[in-house]
UniProtKB/Swiss-Prot annotation:
One Gene Ontology term, aspect cellular component: NADH dehydrogenase complex
Species whose genome carries this gene: Shigella boydii serotype 18 (strain CDC 3083-94 / BS512)
Disulfide-bond pairs as recorded: none
Family listed: Belongs to the complex I subunit 4L family.
Annotated compartments: Cell inner membrane
The protein's assembly and partners: NDH-1 is composed of 13 different subunits. Subunits NuoA, H, J, K, L, M, N constitute the membrane sector of the complex.
Keywords for the protein's UniProt record, in alphabetical order: Cell inner membrane, Cell membrane, Membrane, NAD, Quinone, Translocase, Transmembrane, Transmembrane helix, Transport, Ubiquinone
HAMAP family, A to Z: NDH1_NuoK
Protein name: NADH-quinone oxidoreductase subunit K
EC number(s) on file: 7.1.1.-
GO BP, sorted A to Z: ATP synthesis coupled electron transport
Amino acid sequence: MIPLQHGLILSAILFVLGLTGLVIRRNLLFMLIGLEIMINASALAFVVAGSYWGQTDGQVMYILAISLAAAEASIGLALLLQLHRRRQNLNIDSVSEMRG
């Protein structure tokens, strides 16, 4: 069994990597991938904590987080597809410009 500290450190590293990808990248698709990594890192923390204390609540929260991530990914990808059809790119700087 993995110690609690190792699992939480791994989860924190994954969360920071996702946050870094979210902040540094300018492409919306890569920003969405970074957000997915952050959601999965928090779900991993729930599973590790639940396993450490012998509770099944961590696994239930993992299922909830995965369903949330699936809904977020499907809506995000649909919006990205529409944005790509209208603007022909996914750069965040071109999206934030106002017309007029």
